[in-house]
């Protein structure tokens, strides 16, 4: 029997740089996530987690920052534990410019974790940079989020880190609203505005394409069945060809008017179909629902 494959993502960085968004993204992709875990407890956490499901693959993402204790720069212990359990471990550091961090704190009106020291916000940011410098230096990747909005950051995490780069083709099925623009990174874009719109059904208007009532409505529409059948046949043919052409990942986007019902339903259905066909690296991203 093939031994289980485990992966561990350590997410660290500056407060306000997008660490929470990144961790939530991994959670949405079925990673087992924990935030602000004290560094000294990480080896015990890994041992316990792997014993719970020792026969299955484990994908774990853990957030560590200045709230995780005074030993955040001591990386040897968790690296040693990860290696001992044959875990592929990666450290990602999220950063942003001082100007960006100041603006984000002003917009959210949140307190900086170091504000209890009596520091001004610029002083707290400067001290945090100093305290987290060893983590930044040790990271496999430093992600500067200064120019990212939430949607762009989530997409970046999905395509660059959450979907593994291997000989397997990674698939991202995305939904969007045409009125907010077509995703520029999409490899295939399908227009669902021609399909019946659940928005005009009063009992469905407040729901999304993830809800069973909307799914039932869509599956009763002959045009929807035909649309899905033809797109499924197209993608089944060409995704296999793209993998043979050594592509790493493909983004398939579905658009409708509001990005809430039809496009979400189609993205979810195609992701489910892809998993049933044996594609192991599959994710969904619903831009207008985030």
Curated annotation (Swiss-Prot):
Q: Which keywords does the record carry?
A: ATP-binding, GTP-binding, Nucleotide-binding
Annotated residues for binding of GTP: 65-68
Superkingdom of source:
Bacteria
Cite the GO molecular-function annotations of the record.
ATP binding; GTP binding
- Pfam families linked: PapZ_C, RapZ-like_N
**Residues engaged in binding ATP:** 13-20
Q: State the function annotated in the UniProt record.
A: Displays ATPase and GTPase activities.
Record family assignment: Belongs to the RapZ-like family.
Name of the featured protein: Nucleotide-binding protein PD_0634
Organism in which the protein naturally occurs: Xylella fastidiosa (strain Temecula1 / ATCC 700964)
Tell me the organism's taxonomic lineage. Bacteria, Pseudomonadati, Pseudomonadota, Gammaproteobacteria, Lysobacterales
